[in-house]
């Protein structure tokens, strides 16, 4: 796998697998907005090799609970999958998926989060998010997850940081957060996005 996380059962929850899709082909996706040369295109990446059993064993070693986006492809790697999280993107008749599914080992029943994510149309147009990543998820989705399943003192790890939406929501909720991103271009864009969000929020604290 090439990754060994240092802490043993210290991260309370993992919200992983959200930064990279796996479908057996290479992707090169045009972003919605062009802010700089680096953002003019998403780097081509090979998604033909989804995480194997070693990846999920490592997640289990360092976590107590796991939320894995795209988890409908990895249910055999979760101890229990009675609670699925479904993000309904409120779009129908498109050539893309109507929803995304996270496999979890959380207790309880499956839950649905409704939030439009259809081109330029988003569920919260007042706080519309600039798209910087091919599989970007809204901050509101992670905020809802943390509100429902996280508590003060929890530590969050995202092994596929991507656009950094999970990090922004964790920061807003006052949760400790660790993130990993394999692609430097995505990491730099995520850092820029997070810094802008934190600076904006800090204005209200002055």
Residue ranges with predicted function:
Residues 5-206:
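Class I S-adenosyl-L-methionine
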